[in-house]
Amino acid sequence: MLKFIFMIMFIFFLFFKKNIYWMVQNLIFLATCLFMIKISSNYYFCDISYYFGMDMISYGLILLSFWICGLMLMASEGVVRYNNYVNLFLFMIVFLLLMLIFTFSSMSMFMFYLFFESSLIPTLFLILGWGYQPERLQAGIYLLFYTLLASLPLLIGIFYIKNDNYTMNFIMLSYKNLYNLDFLYLCMIFAFLVKMPMFLVHLWLPKAHVEAPVSGSMILAGVLLKLGGYGLLRVFSLMQVLGMKFNYIWISISLIGGVLVSLICLWQMDLKALIAYSSVAHMGIVLSGLMTMTYWGLNGSYTLMIAHGLCSSGLFCLANISYERMGSRSLLINKGMLNFMPSLSLWWFLLCSGNMAAPPTLNLLGEISLLNSIVSWSWLTMISLAFLSFFSAAYTLYLFAYSQHGKIYSGVYFFSSGTTREFLVLMLHWLPLNLLIMKSNFCMLWI
């Protein structure tokens, strides 16, 4: 692990030079390739140092962080074109990548909390510094207050566990099981529920997505939402008994909330808001599967987290490509694109079909195992799951049909069909999404 952390840290010295944007992007992809070679089939923590280690759960999410950060730099070519504080932008992204690697490889609960919160700072600066509308200040405040307010009880919970067990190490604590500490259970999981985000505490997400630049949206949808799921996977190892007692509450809220959010998607007119709300619906089903605490549920939630990271990041990339051409995110203006961006319509179709879990995407594998686990937990959930699956397909088709079909907006007179760079970014989102299903033991057999 240390070699990758040092590689990323030494990239910081490049920021004193000019014209190093694409070099940094190439270095991040080089680090990704080196990290891919390092795949271990070790289901326990390996590469252990004093505070850092890596197992199969963290491996997939660190790899996703590397991949998405490389693609963010490819997608944000506008920053270089307009020379919009390029080196500061690079610093934010590389610092965010470093924080994410630290978060996913922390073995101490307190270190995990520290880096979990630190990843918020560069995200906030990305939204405030490179966002488009003046409302980004409000979005930044929403993001900050929701996550910080929910995280304070987590800190108290961590110190309580330290006091009780004399350790904060995940491995040591996995042999413990906490009983009769209902308030501690709420303290420990509430921060992760907000980060996921669970329905009812999801209001910061659409705001943050709509105001963020393309890089902010990609990392937010791709990796930062997964921090919540990762935290729950780690914390539930010491809260199984309390989970059996209370988890039905979160499953009910998530499934009913998922259906309601899917309905909200159907009357969205903003491309980015629609994709952001669809993220909330997907994370609802991930959360439900996680809370069943079954083998299928945990594996399925992890698989869908990785699949959703690639898929929704690609969709935000597509929305940005349209926004750069049209100057608007409205579906009333971004319509009839099949007429003047036909080559891009293929990518819209492929990523939309991934979003509604069509085969052979990784989303399908995740959703099938999640459906299995949630239905085995209770037959009643079939009702809301049926609605969720149906509306998920409905709003994705609505997005595709409205944006690609119909008459062209009459105000458009000149259009660039798309550059090789944009097609490459989209292909690098779509390829792993469809190829990973061939190597699904990487996602499914880590328990």
Curated annotation (Swiss-Prot):
GO MF annotation list: NADH dehydrogenase (ubiquinone) activity; ubiquinone binding
Entry's EC annotation: 7.1.1.2
Keyword field contains Mitochondrion: yes
Transmembrane regions listed in the UniProt entry: 28-48, 56-76, 85-105, 110-130, 141-161, 183-203, 213-233, 246-266, 273-293, 301-321, 343-365, 380-400, 409-431
One annotated Gene Ontology cellular component of this protein: mitochondrial membrane
A Pfam family that the UniProt record links to this protein: Oxidored_q5_N
Subcellular location, principal: mitochondrion
Subcellular localization: Mitochondrion membrane
Membrane topology: Multi-pass membrane protein
Reactions that this protein is recorded to catalyse: a ubiquinone + NADH + 5 H(+)(in) = a ubiquinol + NAD(+) + 4 H(+)(out)
Single GO BP term: ATP synthesis coupled electron transport
Domain of life assignment: Eukaryota
Summary of the function given for this chain in its UniProt record: Core subunit of the mitochondrial membrane respiratory chain NADH dehydrogenase (Complex I) that is believed to belong to the minimal assembly required for catalysis. Complex I functions in the transfer of electrons from NADH to the respiratory chain. The immediate electron acceptor for the enzyme is believed to be ubiquinone.
Membership in a protein family: Belongs to the complex I subunit 4 family.
UniProt name for this protein: NADH-ubiquinone oxidoreductase chain 4
Lineage: Eukaryota, Metazoa, Ecdysozoa, Arthropoda, Hexapoda
